[in-house]
Swiss-Prot record:
Organism of provenance: Bacillus velezensis (strain DSM 23117 / BGSC 10A6 / LMG 26770 / FZB42)
Family annotation (Gene3D superfamilies): 3.40.1350.10
Residues that hold Mg(2+) according to the record: T86, D88, E101, Q120
GO cellular component, one term: cytoplasm
Main function: Endonuclease that resolves Holliday junction intermediates in genetic recombination. Cleaves mobile four-strand junctions by introducing symmetrical nicks in paired strands. Promotes annealing of linear ssDNA with homologous dsDNA. Required for DNA repair, homologous recombination and chromosome segregation.
Protein name, as recorded: Holliday junction resolvase RecU
Residues under site feature: Transition state stabilizer: K103
Ranges where the record places region Disordered: 1-34
Length: 202
């Protein structure tokens, strides 16, 4: 049995047939929690086509109880997912380090900043200081947004100074770049990175 930090047990995702996956809408409305799956498929596409090498960081697990039925075998009876201290994804594109977090919300008017933790913000700041490309991909209001880390820090500092604890829909739309959904790649965030960080170098 594996538990998350909030005490809930881990439930494996149900298998989705290829036929159903092909019918997915180009809108994120009423889609459920699929952002991570779509990003993982996108990263597989980037890797297979030698575009970028981006991987999801494994969630750290704390093992609590191990049973040894045999000396040569060990069975994990109880474990907990530990809270990640950094971000979800990292890798490399055209020689630049890429580091980003993926977040979703069902809130219809704002994106709650409680989705982030202090140590994640500090990690992103450290990446930016080293000239890494750091950002957040946010699924909200039926769309997907690319928000640069520097823009996120502005909203975070406002919260830390007893200001608003969320990003309003209009604020997010003004500060971020919308990501058009496709089939392959599904969420083409590299095209935005190319425009922001590499088009001026050519």
């Amino acid at each position: 049995m594996i538990r998350y930090p909030n005490g809930k047990t881990f439930q494996p995702n149900k298998t989705v047939s290829s036929q159903n996956s092909q019918k997915r809408s180009h809108s994120y409305s009423n889609r459920g929690m699929t952002l991570e799956d779509d990003l993982n498929e996108t990263n597989k596409y980037y890797l297979a086509n030698q575009i970028a090498v981006i991987h999801k960081k494994p969630t750290p697990v704390q093992i609590v109880n191990v049973h040894y039925p045999k000396r040569s075998a060990a069975v994990i009876k109880e474990a907990y997912f530990k809270q990640s201290s950094t971000t979800d994804y990292n890798g490399i594109y055209k020689g630049r380090y890429i580091d980003f977090e993926a977040k979703e919300t069902k809130n219809k008017t704002a994106f709650p900043l409680q989705n982030f933790h202090d140590h994640q913000i500090e990690h992103m700041k450290q990446v930016v200081r080293q000239d890494g490309i750091c950002f957040v991909i946010i699924s909200a209001f039926g769309k997907v947004y690319f928000l640069e880390a520097d823009k996120l820090f502005v909203f975070w500092e406002r919260k830390e100074n007893n200001g608003r604890k969320s990003i309003r829909k209009d604020e997010l739309e003004d500060a971020s770049f919308p990501i058009s959904l496709g089939y392959s790649p599904r969420i083409d965030y590299i095209s935005i990175i190319e425009q922001l960080y590499f088009s001026q170098e050519q």
